[in-house]
């Protein structure tokens, strides 16, 4: 942990509420050497403009030529497009390379509670390293986000399954509809995360499973959930608002009717295509964001860094085929 704190200490941290490291450079994945990987960070700030102002003064080399636009314009680029994250990538700190994304507290709150973009919220479905510890309000947001991930995964599973199957669904949620899983990402990524982080996933999700009255963990090989219409209706109602909005929009469009969310959810709970409907809704949020945020990342990184990063991703993809 000290290594990661040292890496992020090059940034101005006065406005930072929370920072975590994620990805294969910080969290062990099966058959991967994390010491060789670039370390990914997310930094949550209460004042994006002030963060960029201080960071440009301290670390101008972290930015592309966009820094010349000034901190006010960088804040606008960050907070008004795609998943509301601004990334600096391929930054050299000592012997390691880091990439860090900056997001405002208000935007991360929106993503964790409502799944507005399923971007930072998706990264926090999985185990991360808390480099700057979150305060109580942020802890509550992260827990609620993971509870939503558990409900979503359970709606995609049958009445009986294994813990490994559950974790596979949870980890896979944020890749649903992501075009990078077709081109640019390791095809075995989800499996590697689950295999390399089983104990951490258990630590994160066991308390949430214990709190769920409609779920029984008999053993790692046998988990049973209540598959009644009442239980499904209950879980559907606990999904984040953006997922419910997508479900309502998709079902009304398919049936050429205009019904309110409550009526749509009640109807869905009685159908046999709940899993497919929920998965389609989640993918409908992630798909456009995966395109727009990738384009934004390339824009903020500049041409040279974007080409280097894309080539590294493509190499990883080809090795996994």
From Swiss-Prot:
Task: Note whether Nuclease occurs among the keywords.
Answer: no
- How the cofactor binds, per note? Magnesium. Also active with cobalt or copper.
Name a Pfam family for this protein.
Tam41_Mmp37
Q: Name one GO biological process term.
A: CDP-diacylglycerol biosynthetic process
**Major location, coarse class?**
mitochondrion
* Keywords assigned: Lipid biosynthesis, Lipid metabolism, Magnesium, Membrane, Mitochondrion, Mitochondrion inner membrane, Nucleotidyltransferase, Phospholipid biosynthesis, Phospholipid metabolism, Transferase
Reaction catalysed by this enzyme: a 1,2-diacyl-sn-glycero-3-phosphate + CTP + H(+) = a CDP-1,2-diacyl-sn-glycerol + diphosphate
Q: Needs which cofactor?
A: Mg(2+); Co(2+); Cu(2+)
Q: How does it sit in the membrane?
A: Peripheral membrane protein
Enzyme class (EC, first level)? transferase
A GO cellular component annotation in the UniProt record = mitochondrion
Enzyme Commission code: 2.7.7.41
The annotated pathway is: Phospholipid metabolism; CDP-diacylglycerol biosynthesis; CDP-diacylglycerol from sn-glycerol 3-phosphate: step 3/3
Family, per the entry? Belongs to the TAM41 family.
Q: What is known about what this protein does?
A: Catalyzes the formation of CDP-diacylglycerol (CDP-DAG) from phosphatidic acid (PA) in the mitochondrial inner membrane. Required for the biosynthesis of the dimeric phospholipid cardiolipin, which stabilizes supercomplexes of the mitochondrial respiratory chain in the mitochondrial inner membrane.
Protein's name in the database: Phosphatidate cytidylyltransferase, mitochondrial
The species is Caenorhabditis briggsae
């Amino acid at each position: 942990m000290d290594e990661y704190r040292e890496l992020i200490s090059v940034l101005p941290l006065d406005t930072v509420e929370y920072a975590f490291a994620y990805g294969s450079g910080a969290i062990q994945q099966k058959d991967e050497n994390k010491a060789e990987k670039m370390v990914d960070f997310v930094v949550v700030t209460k004042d994006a403009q002030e963060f960029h102002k201080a960071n440009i003064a301290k670390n101008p080399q972290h930015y592309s030529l966009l820094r010349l636009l000034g901190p006010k314009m960088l804040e606008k680029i960050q907070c008004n497009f795609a998943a509301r994250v601004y990334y600096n990538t391929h930054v050299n700190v000592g012997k390691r390379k880091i990439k860090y994304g900056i997001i405002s507290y208000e935007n991360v709150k929106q993503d964790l509670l409502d799944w507005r973009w399923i971007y930072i919220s998706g990264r926090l479905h999985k185990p991360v390293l808390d480099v700057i510890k979150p305060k109580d309000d942020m802890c509550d947001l992260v827990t609620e986000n993971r509870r939503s991930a558990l409900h979503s995964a359970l709606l995609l599973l049958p009445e009986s399954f294994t813990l490994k199957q559950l974790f596979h669904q949870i980890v896979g949620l944020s890749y649903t509809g992501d075009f990078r899983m077709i081109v640019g990402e390791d095809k075995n990524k989800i499996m590697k995360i689950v295999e390399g982080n089983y104990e951490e996933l258990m630590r994160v999700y066991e308390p949430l499973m214990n709190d769920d009255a409609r779920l029984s963990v008999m053993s790692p090989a046998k988990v049973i959930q209540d598959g009644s219409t009442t239980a499904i209706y209950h879980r559907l109602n606990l999904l984040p608002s953006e997922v419910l909005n997508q479900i309502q929009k998709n079902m009304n469009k398919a049936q050429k009717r205009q019904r309110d969310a409550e009526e749509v959810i009640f109807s869905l709970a009685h159908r046999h295509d709940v899993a497919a409907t929920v998965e389609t809704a989640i993918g409908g949020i992630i798909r456009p964001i995966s395109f727009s945020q990738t384009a934004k990342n390339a824009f903020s990184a500049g041409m040279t860094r974007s080409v280097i990063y894309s080539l590294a991703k493509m190499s990883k993809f080809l090795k996994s085929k």
